[in-house]
Amino acid sequence: MTKKTIRLLMPQWQGGNNPNYSFGAELLAWLAPDNDQPLIHVPIQAYNGTPLENENGMNGRKQLLEQLEAAQHIIDAHKPDRIVMFGGDCLVEQAPFAYLNERYGGELGLIWIDAHSDLVRYVGYDNGHTLPLGNLLGEGDEEFAKHVKIPLKPENVFIAGLAAPTEQETEAISEAFQRLGIAPAESDTEVIQRLGIKTAGTKELTNSTKSIREWIKESGIKHLAIHLDLDVLDPKAFRSLLFANPEAPYNFSPAGTMQMPQLLNLIKELSEETDVVGLGITEHMPWDAINLKNLLGEIPILNK
């Protein structure tokens, strides 16, 4: 029986409160290989120059909930077996992965390839893209979590590439948090330990991916979704990341250190180990293309 696969383009920017995420998503979808999978656009409220309203501790809460529901309606209408998501900020992952967990009887495996856990609310840093994995586990933000009909099992989740901040990064993050009054409601480590989620950093995975293979086997993962936040990559090697902003450093979390060949090998290995039914790629920030696009937008002869 043929499996039905759909691609979603969700250029959501409100979760990271950065309009550049929209262009990053569109370019990502354009770069992906062509095939016969339909590409469906999830409607997003475009940036109009008005700052997002902070509603109950989240910037753009209203828009984000509306966009989540729009994605859910599209997915439910198509009833796919597999979903590819091009984002956008990390919060775009909630609708497809929640659906896939329902589709596969609450037994979906999820590997979260990300420099950050996306489990924890940061008071004072009120952007929704810090919480998608928490929401999928039935925690995170209560209003978003209630849209997850069957929360993922913590034992079916593995966080790969989780960054450990360097001493210099720790100092910069601490200074930024103190200056802006930012504090986590609960530390990443506390949440990971409380829920019993397995993790591995990039260095460990460079030596061996045995921990992931064992997790797939021990947890009986038959269907797997892959979340890929491109910020797991080393910004010195791959420049299209929030952390590689040529004009302003990003000092709110540690940068990733994974190299692209390692990332590709990991995804290929996962595809051999089990049935990959979901892939979401997020947080693409192509600074050179963004700046060139802005330049072209200001040249008179191109705008007559």
Question: How does the language model describe each region?
Answer:
Residues 147-177, 181-188:
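Hydrophobic, aromatic-enriched interface-forming segments
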Residues 119-120, 165-168, 234, 286-288:
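Active-site environment of divalent metal-dependent phosphoester hydrolases
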Residues 2-84, 92-105, 177-304:
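Catalytic cores of soluble, metal-dependent hydrolases
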Residues 122-123, 170-171, 236-239:
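Short, well-ordered secondary-structure micro-motifs
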Residues 121, 156-166, 259-272:
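A short, hydrophobic secondary-structure junction motif
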Residues 82-156, 160, 274:
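Active-site histidine-anchored catalytic micro-motif
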Residues 115-116, 162-163, 231, 284:
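Histidine- and/or cysteine-centered catalytic micro-motif in compact active-site loops
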